[in-house]
Structures are given as structure tokens and as C-alpha cells.
Swiss-Prot record:
Organism: Listeria monocytogenes serotype 4a (strain HCC23)
Binding note for cofactor: Binds 1 Fe cation per subunit.
Annotated GO MF terms: iron ion binding; S-ribosylhomocysteine lyase activity
Similarity comment: family membership: Belongs to the LuxS family.
The protein's required cofactors: Fe cation
EC top class, as a word: lyase
Gene Ontology biological process terms from the UniProt entry: quorum sensing
Catalyses which reaction(s): S-(5-deoxy-D-ribos-5-yl)-L-homocysteine = (S)-4,5-dihydroxypentane-2,3-dione + L-homocysteine
Listed name of the protein: S-ribosylhomocysteine lyase
Length: 155
């Protein structure tokens, strides 16, 4: 990692972090002053563990739908290609602890879910790849370690 790269996460030393954690990965200010806050929501230890795609996919659907029940400030929830976490972005929602609360409430909702939203061929590009139980297991595991979320480097 000699030179700085354009992608923020490529500048993060993935061997130094300790999952689970939630870190502010970046902010952007729009032309009219709106601010976007992007969080790295890391469920699994990079290069050691990953989420299985059906569980990750269902958790993405559930979080994307359910988070918006807690705030209208959610812009996007996107899975990482490495399958170790998600990016969760908010607009004009600067308080880190409030973002953690939205995440915790959302994951608690996942545990109560009876079905995966938009889990059909009309609304989803890979409707056959879902696991509600897998999503619930991931949510439960992450919630159980909430006391660790702020500790990115395991210190």
C-alpha cells in the first residue's frame, strides 16, 4: 500500500481490523450542503471468514427494507463484494451513535421477520438465492457483539 488509492477501503489495512465493527468510511458534501455518511458495517473478519451468499442476500433485502422504518435518512445499504460486510449510507444524519441505534433496531427487526421482502423473480435479480434463517443467524451474531462495534482495531 505504497500510494494512496481512490477507493477508501483499498487504503484500509484489512489485516489490522477486528470484526465485528462499524466505522465511518467516508463523508461527502453535495452542492447544496447535504452530507452523505458512509459506514463500513463489518460482520466477518476480512480474509478469514465470509457470509454465505443466500444469507447475505436476504440480510441485504431485510436491512434495506426495515432500516427505513427507523429513519428516512437511509440512502443505501449495499453488500461488499468480499462478503464480509455492508456499506450503510445516510444523508444529513451525522451522529455515529444514532446510526448504530438504527442498525441495531434494524437487525432486531430482522430477527422477527417472517419472510424476505422482494424475494421473487419480479423484484429480485437472483430470487433463488435467499436464506431467511441464514440472515437471522447473521443478525443475531452481529447484535450479540454490539459492545465491539466501535472497536475497529480490537484495542
Amino acid at each position: 500500500m505504497a500510494e494512496k488509492m481512490n477507493v477508501e477501503s483499498f487504503n484500509l489495512d484489512h489485516t489490522k481490523v477486528k470484526a465485528p465493527f462499524v466505522r465511518l468510511a467516508g463523508t461527502k458534501v453535495g452542492l447544496h450542503g447535504d452530507e452523505i455518511y458512509k459506514y463500513d458495517v463489518r460482520f466477518k473478519q476480512p480474509n478469514k471468514e465470509h457470509m454465505e451468499m443466500p444469507a447475505l442476500h436476504s440480510l441485504e433485502h431485510l436491512m434495506a427494507e426495515l432500516a427505513r422504518n427507523h429513519t428516512d435518512k437511509v440512502v443505501d445499504i449495499s453488500p461488499m463484494g468480499c462478503q464480509t460486510g455492508f456499506y450503510m449510507s445516510f444523508i444529513n444524519f451525522s451522529d455515529y451513535d444514532d446510526a448504530l441505534d438504527v442498525l441495531a433496531k434494524t437487525l432486531a427487526d430482522v430477527l422477527e421477520a417472517k419472510e424476505v421482502p422482494a424475494c421473487n423473480e419480479v423484484q429480485c435479480g437472483w430470487a433463488a438465492s435467499h436464506s431467511l434463517e441464514g440472515a437471522k443467524e447473521l443478525a443475531e451474531e452481529f447484535l450479540a457483539k454490539r459492545s465491539e462495534w466501535k472497536n475497529v482495531f480490537g484495542e
